[in-house]
């Protein structure tokens, strides 16, 4: 009876370990994916704690193996990323392609690699924290927005803390203002 009991307990332990290891492997595999994820109504900005979907304009996210950090604006994400300790993280950065989205509610189906995006800085459009850096996959879309709403087109590597501070000061405390009337699309034709 003891031998039978030990065999049953040993078998049960082996089965539990097998399921446990399989479960760990699956969980690890999901976390290793560095693909963008959708924004949800309950998501809060990693920097300021605001509900992300309550505000217009492009958003950002940093996807790591340990999880996803979401941001209410591209400016918030870029400001976070430019901190020296964050640049050491193995994270992939994403922003909305505003060439394929409406300003009031960017489409999560069009999240692009932030490091290869074109950014329009100094537009009249406002995002969650006032200053907005409109993000685009295509340079011609960025130039079209700059032509309609002002600003200049920059690449990811041209953005630094001084530029983000300059963009914020241009908004004159426009924090949480929504896009002006008629600014429904990031640019005409999309």
UniProtKB/Swiss-Prot annotation:
Q: Where is the signal peptide?
A: 1-23
Q: How does it sit in the membrane?
A: Lipid-anchor
Output the Gene3D superfamilies linked to this UniProt entry. 3.30.70.2050, 3.30.70.2060
Q: Which domain of life is it from?
A: Bacteria
Record-given protein name? Copper-binding lipoprotein NosL
Q: Where is the composition biased (Low complexity)?
A: 180-190
The GO terms describing molecular function are: metal ion binding
């Amino acid at each position: 009876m003891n031998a039978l009991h030990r065999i049953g307990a040993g078998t049960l332990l082996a089965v539990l370990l097998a399921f446990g290891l399989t479960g760990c492997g699956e969980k690890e595999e999901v976390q290793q994916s560095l693909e963008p994820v959708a924004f949800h109504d309950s998501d809060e900005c990693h920097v300021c704690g605001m509900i992300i979907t309550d505000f217009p304009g492009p958003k950002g996210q940093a996807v790591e193996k340990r999880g996803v950090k979401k941001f209410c604006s591209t400016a918030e994400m870029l400001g976070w990323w430019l901190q020296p300790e964050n640049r050491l993280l193995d994270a992939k950065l994403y922003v909305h392609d505003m060439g394929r989205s409406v300003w009031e509610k960017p489409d999560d189906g069009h999240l692009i690699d932030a490091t290869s995006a074109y950014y329009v800085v100094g537009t009249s459009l406002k995002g969650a924290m006032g200053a907005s850096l409109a993000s685009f996959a295509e340079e011609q879309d960025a130039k079209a927005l700059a032509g309609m709403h002002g600003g200049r087109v920059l690449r990811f590597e041209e953005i630094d803390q001084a530029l983000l501070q300059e963009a914020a000061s241009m908004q004159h405390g426009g924090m949480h203002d929504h896009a002006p009337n008629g600014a429904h699309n990031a640019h005409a034709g999309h």
